């Protein structure tokens, strides 16, 4: 990688103001610092500075993958649709999957993930348990036709991803591959300067029954998670918390008039009870078209991802569908529900005996509804989002809530793809068995956004040394000065010769412009050369992350910077 670049020759068109389209800090700063440019919704060009960052992130990934024996390769981004038919994902994936035809009218897809491609690749080659385990990976563009691409590199339609796939003969071997990748992902995040928390996650469309995400903690993160001081953490889409449900009052079933109390908030105020002591009824149509009512604690919300796992591709009932099902909006309860309704409740309510619920009559609720006496729940589901204050399933203490950016995820797929695609090997007894698979993804371009979200201030980006596009910016205050400019060239040459990566601001701009751009681009160290300092044989060195300034003798500058930069490299 080139270690010396002149600012006048660098293609990095900076902006003074935040672009109106940008919402997240990372999106604003990457645009303003001249690192990315939008081509179309969800499609971005990576300009030279950003590409250097991406290259460094990829170098870290390759180093860690080599350390655990994973082998790099490259598969085509275009995949025959028939492979997705074999895995049963072609119809299930939805409109996010970009489909296309070639000139011969053959169907293809643009790969958002490559489980099918890699399974097809090995199924005729890995024939014996003696050849296993094998882990293959690639770093490649992916495409997902997001309905609403936003947040810059955070949720684009085209993105760079490292995806790995392991093939094992036994569960023990799969677990070892999974643990190796999980540990490597933790090291990758740390080496890239990202504080990431491993959290229990939902497997989504990829499948499998075990998954962990690495979440970069950030206030602007799309994902919600809960975590506990004991070390437990989970995405709210997967968290199974112990919810402290307030019990209703015991007594004889009593119908009470609750005019206009069609929401939990209104009911709570009217009857003077905590929202947690009420039961919320949610009416939906499940994936099989059945009218369904699910009861959850009144102070909790249903999680869409969990609901899809429980009910398939569901939708909330419209007013017309409510009327057709004989349900009264805002006053639905388990006592006296119409026939033909699928009735469920969240697991959090399983041990709750006394309920305050709708009476299936406009403007009325039931107090003292007793499970078993007045109603039964035939089906229990896990659909509630965990929230702050819910109890940790591991230690029982209250959990905290945070937001995060998903930068990577690991999955144990089991035989989901190998069985459906007929990918087998011969075991020790010669019996054909499906591969036990794992898959492991890192969002490379998303990692760049996460780094910026965690490393910035009011003036711009503060790149960690490990991933910075360059390590030092030399800023001569007057390039026309016969004393300053030759010294700037000499310092740049010496730093570059010492294996440091240097950006020289050789532009004939005012000092204020140079300082603003230097802070915006955010290289870790700035060497500022003015006439007085050069005369005194000193350089002013600024640490971008802390703002600290140091007067460093010219003859010590190279060693001074090297001592601080080299140990911080990834």
Regions found by a protein language model. Name each.
Residues 1-570:
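NTP/phosphate- and nucleic-acid-binding module
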């Amino acid at each position: 990688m080139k270690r010396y670049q002149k600012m006048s020759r660098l293609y990095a068109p900076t902006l003074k103001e935040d672009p109106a389209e940008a919402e997240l800090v990372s999106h604003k700063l990457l645009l303003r610092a001249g690192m990315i440019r939008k081509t179309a919704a969800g499609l971005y060009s990576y300009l030279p500075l950003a590409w250097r960052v991406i290259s460094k992130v990829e170098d870290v990934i390759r180093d860690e993958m080599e350390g655990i024996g994973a082998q790099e390769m490259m598969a085509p981004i275009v995949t025959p649709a028939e492979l997705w038919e074999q895995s049963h994902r072609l119809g299930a994936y939805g409109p996010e999957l970009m489909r296309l035809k070639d000139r011969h009218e053959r169907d293809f897809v643009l790969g958002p993930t490559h489980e099918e491609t890699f399974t097809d690749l090995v199924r005729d080659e890995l024939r014996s348990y003696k050849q296993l385990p094998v882990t293959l990976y690639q770093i490649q563009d992916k495409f997902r036709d997001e309905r609403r691409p936003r947040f810059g590199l955070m949720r684009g339609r085209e993105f760079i991803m490292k995806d790995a796939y392991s093939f094992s003969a036994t569960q023990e071997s799969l677990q070892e591959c999974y643990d190796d990748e999980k540990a490597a992902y933790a090291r990758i995040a740390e080496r890239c300067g990202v504080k990431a928390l491993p959290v229990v996650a939902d497997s989504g469309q990829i499948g499998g029954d075990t998954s962990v995400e690495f979440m970069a903690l950030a206030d602007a993160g799309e994902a919600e998670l809960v975590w506990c001081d004991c070390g437990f953490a989970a995405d709210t889409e997967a968290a199974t918390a112990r919810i402290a449900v307030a019990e209703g009052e015991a007594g004889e079933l009593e119908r009470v008039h609750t005019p206009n109390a069609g929401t939990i908030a209104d009911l709570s105020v009217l009857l003077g009870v905590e929202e947690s002591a009420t039961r919320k009824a949610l009416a939906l149509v499940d994936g099989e078209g059945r009218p369904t009512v699910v009861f959850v604690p009144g102070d909790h919300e249903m999680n869409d991802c969990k609901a899809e796992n429980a009910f398939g591709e569901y939708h909330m009932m419209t007013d017309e569908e409510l009327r057709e099902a004989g349900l009264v909006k805002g006053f639905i309860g388990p006592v006296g529900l119409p026939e033909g309704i699928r009735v469920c409740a969240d697991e959090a309510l399983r041990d709750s005996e006394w309920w305050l619920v709708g009476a299936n009559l406009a403007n009325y609720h039931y107090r003292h509804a007793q499970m078993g006496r007045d109603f039964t729940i035939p089906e229990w589901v896990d659909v509630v989002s965990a929230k702050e204050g819910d109890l940790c399933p591991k230690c029982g203490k209250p959990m905290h809530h945070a937001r995060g950016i998903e930068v990577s995820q690991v999955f144990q797929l089991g035989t989901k793809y190998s069985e459906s695609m007929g990918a087998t090997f011969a075991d020790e007894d010669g019996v054909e068995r499906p591969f036990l698979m794992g898959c492991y993804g890192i969002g490379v371009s998303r990692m760049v956004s996460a780094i910026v979200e965690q490393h910035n201030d009011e003036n711009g980006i503060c790149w960690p040394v490990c991933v910075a596009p360059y390590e030092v910016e030399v800023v001569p205050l007057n390039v026309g000065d016969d004393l300053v400019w030759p010294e700037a060239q000499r310092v740049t040459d010496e730093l570059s010769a010492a294996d440091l990566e240097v950006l020289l601001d050789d532009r004939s701009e005012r000092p204020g412009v140079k300082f603003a751009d230097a802070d915006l681009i955010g290289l870790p160290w700035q060497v500022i050369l003015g006439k007085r300092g050069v005369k005194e044989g000193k350089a002013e060195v600024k640490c971008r992350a802390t703002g600290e300034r140091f007067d460093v003798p010219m003859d010590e500058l190279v060693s001074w910077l090297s001592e601080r930069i080299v140990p911080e490299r990834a």
